Amino acid sequence: MLLQKSAKTIMKREYDNENRIHLYGISQYWAAFDKSAYLLEKMTNKESETTVLHFKDYPFPILMYCLHYEKVKDLCRKHIMAKQNPDYLQLLTHHIAPKSYSQ
């Protein structure tokens, strides 16, 4: 699984994240984790389910939110893409206060 091999990189990106959605390509879906998952869920009006993941090497639960690549393609037309690779996208979005994420 993506998190097993890239968890440190993903969580490092999410640590201070307040206005970016980091998306990772998984087959026909794009997955967002932690704060990116929260932002994506708010942006898409909960079109998908949020999954809570637990890893033995990470002390906190990690949120995961997945969308079909067609839905993400629509989002890319409406939002600024900061980075685009075949298996990684970064979208700019509105700023979130850390307090609103932790609730």
Regions of interest found by a model, annotated:
Residues 1-103:
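Basic, polar low-complexity surface loops/patches
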